[in-house]
Structures are given as structure tokens and as C-alpha cells.
Amino acid sequence: MIERIIDTEVIKDLFFKYKEKYNPIINDYTFILSYKIDNKYVAFLIYQLLYEKAEVIDIFVLEEYRRKGIGKALLEEMMKDKTIESITLEVKESNKNAILLYNSLGFKEVAKRKGYYNGVDALLMLKEVK
């Protein structure tokens, strides 16, 4: 089941172990979609929305739930937001499975960021939604 988390206290509790990473980005422009199975959070997608432009900050699926369409379902749910006209994201150039997923959803590579992930290059990808 996909749900939008809007209570900032729930967000902070949910991501407590990632506090240092995510606290600086939790604001009025941050949205989180979560995926629950048997009342357990197994995946989330964090994005920021400024006017009609969305940026995926992170997408995470617990390892035992990967390659089951959950990440795709979260991205498709995000794309249903009628206010979003374009979506950008960064992905490690070596993360071939993620790149295949993003390509299957219509994302295109628009730039490369040298050394973005601790010396590993990232691809900047874009999808026009409208």
C-alpha cells in the first residue's frame, strides 16, 4: 500500500537512523511516499517540489523487497501529482538496474556529474510529465 506521509513527526521518527542525512531537507517543499507491506515500511521515495519542478531526493527499497516493482510503483504514484511538470534525479552511473527502471519510465539522461557520489560519477536524468 502506498501512502503519502505528511506528519513531520512521523517523518522524523521513520527516518530516525538517517536523521543527519534527511533532517536538513525536511521542509514545506518535501514530500514522502511510503510503501507498506503487512503494516511494515519497506520503501520510500522522498522528493521536493518547487512550483512545477520535482526533484527526487532519494528512493529506497529494503533489499529483500527489491526487483518486485515497488520502486516503480512509488515513482508512478509521484507522477500522478497533477502539479508536477518535470522530474529530475541523480543516479550512480554504475547503478544499471536503477537506470533501466528510470529509462522504462521515460527518464532521459541530460548530464553527467563528475565525482558526485564520493568520486563516482552520477547521471542527471529528466522526465517531462506534461
Give residue ranges: language-model regions.
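Conserved GNAT acetyl-CoA-binding A-motif
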Residues: 81-93
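C-terminal "cap" of GNAT-fold acetyltransferases
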Residues: 92-96, 115-130
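Conserved glycine-rich acetyl-CoA-binding loop
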Residues: 59-76, 92-100, 104-105
